[in-house]
Amino acid sequence: MNALFIIIFMIVVGAIIGGITNVIAIRMLFHPFKPYYIFKFRVPFTPGLIPKRREEIATKIGQVIEEHLLTETLINEKLKSEQSQQAIESMIQQQLQKLTKDQLSIKQITSQIDIDLEQVLQTNGNQYIESQLNNYYTKHQNQTIASLLPNQLVTFLDQHVDNATDLLCDRARNYLSSAKGTQDINDMLDTFFHEKGKLIGMLQMFMTKESIADRIQQELIRLTSHPKARTIVTSLITNEYQTFKDKPLNELLDASQFNEIAENLSVYVTTYASNQANKPVVTLMPQFVDYLEGQLSSKLANLIIEKLSIHLSTIMKKVDLRGLIEEQINTFDLDYIEKLIIEIANKELKLIMSLGFILGGIIGFFQGLVAIFV
């Protein structure tokens, strides 16, 4: 009976010592948070293991995560997966649907990224357009008009300049045959008769004003179809056209005239652009929006993934994942780190404490046996 009591007593004492030892050991992982000194001597085991080695632990955690968890290869594989493709494409589709549903304008879209489009157009837009036009004039002012126009346009004009004769004669014939043409001829005759006085009075003894006007009208109409008249018109138009082509830009427009045109054009362009920017994109560019929703979303998702994949190494170096994790861990309060580790390893820490009680009890059992037989 005495022997059994000794064994039980030793088991209980051993279990208590083993359990408390493990509890203290676990506690000493975190506490104390700072070193304590007696006179000039630091008390052993202060601070605790984790507070003492926090920077080293942060470095190792960052290294493990960068080299074994969030590796470039793993991120690249995840980025190229079908799930990532679908997620990016879905996000693009959602933004496009919002664009259509909310009737967003270009101005509203740019305002979401803190860009005042109207202000940009009125300041930078005007200055940029005027600057580009003035630079163009300075550079090309001594060149001929023909050399400044696109070759295709010059060729087209060369081929169709003769058509101007037909157009001009047809328009003149239509005008002369119209009521307005008849009235204008009569008005000019009235003025002519009034200015010439007696000479015209003698002419009116043989012909009435109406017959004179009618005769003039018929002759002018006939003249528009006369081959010689058309040849003269063609020659005049061709000569003027050739003169226009060979004229230098600064002869057609001097610097002040060009500056005035540049100012007016820049104001017109920026005003027009500003007005268009206030219209919903779906109204302004319906076909483009349809293209975005139908095809471009998939292509854009592929492009984003491709570009991210190509530049992933550079991005990861710039992000410095290891340094970021180290910095973040080092900013945590020690209380928070203790709470975090206990939450993660709570079950395991309890098992360690239980194991301390069990091992202590087993050791106490053997110590009891030794105490009985020795």
UniProtKB/Swiss-Prot annotation:
Belongs to the UPF0754 family. It is found in: Cell membrane. It is a multi-pass membrane protein. It comes from Staphylococcus aureus (strain JH9). The chain crosses the membrane at residues 4-24, 354-374. InterPro entries: DUF445 (IPR007383), UCP032178 (IPR016991). Pfam families: DUF445. Keywords: Cell membrane, Membrane, Transmembrane, Transmembrane helix. This is UPF0754 membrane protein SaurJH9_1899. It comes from the Bacteria. GO terms for cellular component: plasma membrane.
